[in-house]
Amino acid sequence: MGGFPEATGNLLDAAAQEFHPTVCAPYPLQPLPQQLYCPHPYPAMPVPPPPQIAMLQPVPPMAMAMAPQPGYTLPTTTPVVNGPSSRVVVLGLVPPHAQEADVAQAMAPFGAIRSVDACAVASEGVATVHFFDIRAAELALTCVREQHMRQQSRLGQLYAAAAVAPAWAPAPTPQAWDWPHPNDDGRGLVLGHAVWAHFATGADDGDNRGSLVVLSPLPGVSVADLRQVFQAFGDLKDVRESAQRPSHKFVDFFDTRDAARALAELNGQELFGRRLVVEFTRPSGPGPRRRGYAPHQHRPTAPTPPRLQATWRPSQPTSSQPPASSSSSGSVRAREGVVLLRRSSCKSSAGSDQSSKGGNAGTSHERKTKGGKIVVAAAAASSSTPTASGKQTQKGVGSSGGGSWKGRKSGWEARFLFKEPEAGGGADTQATPASEMDTRTTVMIRNIPNKYSQKLLLNMLDNHCIQSNEWIVASGEEQPFSAYDFVYLPIDFNNKCNVGYGFVNLTSPEARVRLYKAFHKQPWEVYNSRKICQVTYARVQGLEALKEHFKNSKFPCDSDEYLPVAFSPARDGKELTDPVPIVGRSPAASSASSPPKSRAASVDRLGQELMPAPSSSADGASSTTTSTHAPSEHDEEEEEGDIRLAGELRRLGYDD
């Protein structure tokens, strides 16, 4: 055969025996440790394990295990956890099929649970548990870590002997097996699985973190006397004086429910010859809450995570300013629990509000248009128009010159704009005699999310009126209450969405000013909208003029929710007057002969005639078609629709 002359026969002998190496490796291959499933009660172990070997300190769950060494014993308790304690415990390595009820059932033996957030269990194996008592959270973390370390010890016992003992060494003498632990009752396991836990530092965000501060000076009252008063409401963690202000006393409760009960019972009560002023301790670190903090706004005593937070409305404001005008008063909420408007910071509002000033008057005149005769509110000349908040750059249609139409100008004549409030003052009514106050009451609310319904708009106005009227009662000022008697939210009947603006008639100029201060330049928080609410005067003013404007009009729709409505008596949130349509509606079938878009355009024109005239200083627009469909949720498309709308209004002659 070629290549090996001395070889005879076939080298690949089929009858040859299988080759076996004669030299073995000194250490066998070590299999990777696996997560054990430990149902409760624990099953009996059939085979005794190798000698007990444990690690010195607990190891986080995803860390690589070090080679165990013999001669060490397992600590009986988990070492003290470094870092501050919290009432929020984050669980890791949670079984992906676990539900919120399973996590709550596993953590319930440690103490009362405020809420459980298990939305990240399926994707990340993480669940968040909020306890009322910080002692319950500490106990839960200790037990969960003990269970995890006990399982790591068992894994070490299973695989350590193979890693340290040679193959020729004699078998070790069986020792006692700690399965199950004599004091183990299954606590700390989630569906029989050992998990890991750590505190969520900074996640216990809210007014009530179990800490109160007594602001009223109490001369001659010691910390021991104060402890005796507050400990009647629950166990105290600490009572101390402020290092910066010794007159302020801090009282820390273990349980947030005890702190809320103490605040409700003692705040404003006569004690030690003084009226107690008690508040929740503000956050000590920097952040938006630190910058925009306002004392004691009566928020929920036990705030839940954002996904689980319920609707809440204060029963009585205590601030010296209207809740809607306070930078930290929170957002206006609808009755169904929808967050409507998000308050912006004081600095940003003040910076944008001081950009300009405007003037207005209260006269009116009539004007002929293609749609008939309408009443137009006239005003004196004004100085300048404010810069609208929003994007500074965008794509424009029919724009002339650099910059954007919405970013540089407000787009409306100055006589339809509110006089911006100066620093520390109000709008329109600040230092203005009653005889010179603008008497207009009808406003236009712009940049409404297109999915907003008339019902949500009424809920928003009801909440605003309730808060404003409660502030008037609490402050003792003699002002007309906030109420409204007309609402119109134009709807595109093709897709059942609003067209981005609406009209409201208030019952007094003071109510109009309060609505402006509450809503103008505030972002919405519904439907993931990034629109900025804007409030201007409407072209047609007064309830009677609005009724005359819609006289003999019929809307081709099948629901009264799409019609302009009036309220008699006026609606103020507590007096929930039913809306009464001021126009008729024709069945959709009777108007089938006309194109849908033309019908929508005719109805939309009635709403456009209520709008203020666009400013002549705004960029020109060459568009000759009106967009009657609801704008897209994308900001650029919405802004392009506003540009086309302004151009169409100028084309129709509304440019004086």
Swiss-Prot record:
GO MF term set: RNA binding
InterPro entries for this protein: EAR1-like_RRM3, Mei2-like_Rrm_C, Nucleotide-bd_a/b_plait_sf, RBD_domain_sf, RRM_dom
Low complexity: bias regions: 314-331, 377-397, 585-601, 612-630
Annotated spans, Disordered: 280-408, 576-656
Any Gene Ontology CC annotation: nuclear speck
SMART domains in the cross-refs: RRM (SM00360)
Repeat listed as a keyword: yes
Bias type Basic residues, positions: 288-299
Phenotype upon gene inactivation: Plants almost double the number of leaves, and plant height are reduced to about the half that of the wild-type. Internode number is increased and their elongation is significantly reduced. The terminal tassel (terminal male inflorescence) is replaced by an ear-like (female-like) inflorescence.
PANTHER family: RNA RECOGNITION MOTIF-CONTAINING
Biological role stated in the UniProt entry: Probable RNA-binding protein. Involved in the regulation of leaf initiation rate and shoot development. Seems to act more predominantly in the early stages of the leaf development, rather than in the later phase.
Protein name: Protein terminal ear1
Organism: Zea mays (Maize)
Gene name, Swiss-Prot/TrEMBL: TE1
